[in-house]
Amino acid sequence: MSFNAEWSIEEHKTAGGRSHFAEFVAGLTDAKDIKDAAALIGVLRALGNQLREPRSKSLEDGLFELRGTQVRIYYGFLPGRRVVLVGGYVKKRTDTPRDVLRLMRGRLKEVRDEYQKSRVGTAGTKGR
């Protein structure tokens, strides 16, 4: 086993296949923000749960905020060195609006619920 294994980066998708993170990135217009987002994902892939402040901030309920100059990327972890991106935000003021954080927490809850359903669905099929 390699101790330098990269983390798997995944995007949360809705039941309809929509990726809020991909939409966030597609909506970035400032070249600095685009470059910042790409660099942040690279650091996250390399360091995963070893990231600390000021680059990554643990919010509540397992939600994390990856912090660039203005770009914020929201994510959580799943077993197996998996990172799930749930969305992003370009910071325009000193504090992130509560509705943005509430939305990101809701998306992460969806991710965890889907993961639990998949575990329950496969638990009964082992050994068959």
Give the label of every model feature segment:
Residues 1-70, 79-83, 90-128:
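Basic, Lys/Arg-enriched alpha-helical interface segments
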